[in-house]
Amino acid sequence: MFWTFKEWFWLERFWLPPTIKWSDLEDHDGLVFVKPSHLYVTIPYAFLLLIIRRVFEKFVASPLAKSFGIKETVRKVTPNTVLENFFKHSTRQPLQTDIYGLAKKCNLTERQVERWFRSRRNQERPSRLKKFQEACWRFAFYLMITVAGIAFLYDKPWLYDLWEVWNGYPKQPLLPSQYWYYILEMSFYWSLLFRLGFDVKRKDFLAHIIHHLAAISLMSFSWCANYIRSGTLVMIVHDVADIWLESAKMFSYAGWTQTCNTLFFIFSTIFFISRLIVFPFWILYCTLILPMYHLEPFFSYIFLNLQLMILQVLHLYWGYYILKMLNRCIFMKSIQDVRSDDEDYEEEEEEEEEEATKGKEMDCLKNGLRAERHLIPNGQHGH
């Protein structure tokens, strides 16, 4: 049964244009062509990237965070068995009636009970150091892969002439630069997917799962169907904006408001140009319209463009939130990351303001400076 399914799955009519056989894509005369088996290495490479990430966060990101004045903070609350049991077994957000009853039971004021629950919720928030480490790692990878992508593509004719994307398709040999560009990019997305449950959780958690799965599916499919040339263009268009986002987040956690805001505006500009202009009017035009001058519609052509359109929907989704943030900054002078961590940013800010009134000296508020001055207090995580 397995072999029957395998034979059906790899039928040429699903993957290749009519009249083309898998035998046409076998290596010959020193030319190497893509093979699905090439992608097996992306899983072990993903775990290797996780090891490299761990080393990077410890020996590069942590010292860098320290130089910015970001330290590991241990949030402690006064032990209280009654409140702790209610927090764990009932709710983390007690109603006013609950607060009144707990205050009576613990011989505390209602304000003290509210402060205890707020502090207890904040105790489980990821620290600024952890957020900085994650952003620093993503920044380093996106910078490396973008520079590598530009180096791989700058002398390729299909970067400047989209007709070259389909010249000779699908009998286009695989270049070593294309191999490593794909393998590294796919391995990175696998590593992000493996770490989603352990990294800082955000409200757009489901969107990230969809994005990573769509990215891996798209790269895997484009590899197997030998859409390598268009695939490299898709990857470079996506990576070029993320560098600025992750760097903005790093400076956000460091409390460098002016630098963070400047980088975020740069990111927003590049995002809208690359993903809402270049992607739909250049990439989708290349994959949706140009093939029809050479080929009749076939299954992989339809499936490829379906996946690209899913990505475009995600672009519009993230673009909407970016516009909301920019609108708040420009017109309301108050900005909060509407896609930030699951915990309430206002809670932590309020707690810190209370500490400040007690005379505790702070360099800046956790997760960046005050909301009315900072573009991304908890860090924006878009793709």
Curated annotation (Swiss-Prot):
Indicate where this protein is primarily found.
Answer: endoplasmic reticulum
Show the catalytic activity: a very long-chain fatty acyl-CoA + a sphingoid base = an N-(very-long-chain fatty acyl)-sphingoid base + CoA + H(+); docosanoyl-CoA + sphinganine = N-docosanoylsphinganine + CoA + H(+); tetracosanoyl-CoA + sphinganine = N-tetracosanoylsphinganine + CoA + H(+); hexacosanoyl-CoA + sphinganine = N-hexacosanoylsphinganine + CoA + H(+)
Domain TLC span(s) in chain numbering: 130-331
Compositionally biased tracts (Acidic residues): 342-355
- Cellular compartments per GO CC: endoplasmic reticulum; endoplasmic reticulum membrane
Q: Which residue ranges does the record annotate as region Disordered? A: 342-363
Q: State which Enzyme Commission number(s) the record gives.
A: 2.3.1.24, 2.3.1.298, 2.3.1.297
Catalytic EC class:
transferase
Q: Where is this region: Homeobox-like?
A: 66-127
Q: In which tissues is it expressed?
A: Expressed in the epidermis, where it localizes at the interface between the stratum granulosum and the stratum corneum (at protein level).
Q: In which pathway does it act?
A: Lipid metabolism; sphingolipid metabolism
Domain of life (superkingdom): Eukaryota
Which InterPro entries does the record match to this protein?
A: HD (IPR001356), Homeodomain-like_sf (IPR009057), Lag1/Lac1-like (IPR016439), TLC-dom (IPR006634)
Kindly report every residue range on the membrane side named Cytoplasmic. Answer: 319-383
Q: Where are the transmembrane segments?
A: 32-52, 139-159, 174-194, 205-225, 264-284, 298-318
Gene3D superfamilies per record: Homeodomain-like
Query: Which subcellular locations apply to this protein?
Result: Endoplasmic reticulum membrane
- Which residues are annotated with the PTM Phosphoserine? S340
Query: Is DNA-binding there in the keyword field?
Result: no
For this protein, the record's SMART domains field holds: HOX, TLC
- Mention one GO biological process in which this protein takes part, according to its record: keratinocyte differentiation
In UniProt terms, what function does this protein have? Ceramide synthase that catalyzes the transfer of the acyl chain from acyl-CoA to a sphingoid base, with high selectivity toward very- and ultra-long-chain fatty acyl-CoA (chain length greater than C22). N-acylates sphinganine and sphingosine bases to form dihydroceramides and ceramides in de novo synthesis and salvage pathways, respectively. It is crucial for the synthesis of ultra-long-chain ceramides in the epidermis, to maintain epidermal lipid homeostasis and terminal differentiation.
Q: Which disease is it linked to?
A: Ichthyosis, congenital, autosomal recessive 9: A form of autosomal recessive congenital ichthyosis, a disorder of keratinization with abnormal differentiation and desquamation of the epidermis, resulting in abnormal skin scaling over the whole body. The main skin phenotypes are lamellar ichthyosis (LI) and non-bullous congenital ichthyosiform erythroderma (NCIE), although phenotypic overlap within the same patient or among patients from the same family can occur.
Q: What is this protein called?
A: Ceramide synthase 3
Name of encoding gene: CERS3
